[in-house]
Amino acid sequence: MAKLSGTQTHENLKMAFAGESQANRRYLYFAQKADVEGYPDVAALFRSVAEGETGHAFGHFDFLAEVGDPVTGVAVGATSDNLNSAITGETFEYTEMYPGFSKTARDEGFEEIAEWLEVLARAEKSHAGRFTQGLETLND
């Protein structure tokens, strides 16, 4: 097979992976709303399709894995590689992404959103720590 890295197909797979992943989360959110509104059959429909979207995302990721994690660029494969990728992603989120987003929200007058993003930064820091502990257990 041709080299995937740096091709338009690589970019297309990354966009498709992101889209399918987001569809999964959106449909799970919609399912919660349908449950609250008393539509359990519609909620089940959303959950069923969300699971299908997960399968689509996993299919894209199978191809992307040969190049590396589409978010972090870190190698995908062994559990230690996957933990390192997770640590890289979570660390970026709590050190750069959410602090930057929070500052922008605050600068634009969205204090409640800024505070929410700061909560998420703390959560992502915790996630990075938990993944780091998981990696350390592999090295024991």
How would you describe each model-predicted region?
Residues M1-D140:
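Non-heme di-metal
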